[in-house]
Design a protein with these regions (language model features):
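Signature of uroporphyrinogen-III synthase
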Residues: 1-261
Length: 261
């Protein structure tokens, strides 16, 4: 691999604003010109009644399970509106889905007791059940509005755990048709466009008419962050050029390099 395998390549990231800075850094270090087209936005809107009940019961939980970095941020932002001392979490243990979630947890000076080796919620549940006895233990699953109920169901039915669920954020489509970023994308196109979730793929499809590169512009190759997003691209009929082996900046950079080789 040359020192700058992405020299002068234009790569578009579709993550929400303020997310994926390490992805951008890794791509820029490889020589890419990176632009952002945030197809989604994150809103932190937990149900206040449910959240109050959860915080009242913090000392009762054996595990808190986070499915995303957004879940970590959304939960602790509200946690510190109630408490001033991180020790108020009690003796709870933490499980995280993926390295980005683990990294977000460490920002609160907390370590993950279990981080899933694969980037899907059911793998996290199976690892938790296999490596720890959670039968009759009380678990809190912190998640968002688009997550399926499969993980809580697995833990409740498969591990016989007592499971509470709180949704602390919502992922919503962001209209970018009139944005400067969309105008630039139409004018220049891109060599690659990176999708980080099925919902980003869906948002792209809904806005496809306003995101079509002009004649003569570069036609981007689609790169997925993982298998679930790759499946969403295939189902949408978007040719898949590459899939990252893990949801990390290095793996995403390597997938883009391979797709454009």
């Amino acid at each position: 691999m040359s020192k700058l395998p992405l020299r002068d390549r234009l790569v578009v990231l579709t993550r929400p604003e303020g997310r994926g800075a390490d992805w951008k850094d890794a791509l820029v270090e490889a020589g890419a010109v990176v632009s952002e087209l945030p197809l989604l936005e994150i809103k932190f809107e937990p149900d206040d009644t449910v959240l109050s009940e959860v915080l009242d019961a913090m000392g009762e939980y054996d595990w808190v399970v986070f499915t995303s970095a957004n879940g970590v941020r959304g939960f602790f932002d509200r946690f510190f509106e109630r408490f001033t001392d991180i020790r108020s979490v009690g003796g709870v243990r933490f499980a995280c889905l993926g390295p980005a979630t683990e990294k977000a947890l460490r920002q609160y000076h907390l370590d993950s007791d279990l981080t899933a080796t694969q980037n899907d919620a059911l793998s996290l549940g199976r690892e938790l059940m296999t490596k720890h006895d959670v039968e009759n233990q009380k678990l809190l699953v912190v998640t968002g509005n688009l997550n399926t109920p499969e993980l809580p169901r697995l833990l409740a039915d498969g591990a016989m755990a007592i499971v509470d669920v709180i949704k602390v954020y919502a992922t919503e489509e962001k209209s970018v048709a009139e944005s400067p970023e969309a105008a630039e994308f139409r004018r220049r196109g891109a060599d690659a466009i990176v999708f980080a979730s099925p919902s980003a793929v869906e948002s792209f499809l809904h806005q496809a008419a306003s995101l079509r590169p002009d004649a003569g512009a570069r036609q981007p190759k689609a790169v997925a962050i993982g298998a679930t997003t790759a499946d969403a691209l295939r189902k949408a009929g978007i040719p898949l050029a590459g899939t990252a082996s893990a949801p990390t900046a290095k793996a995403i950079r390597d997938a883009v390099v391979a797709a454009l080789a």
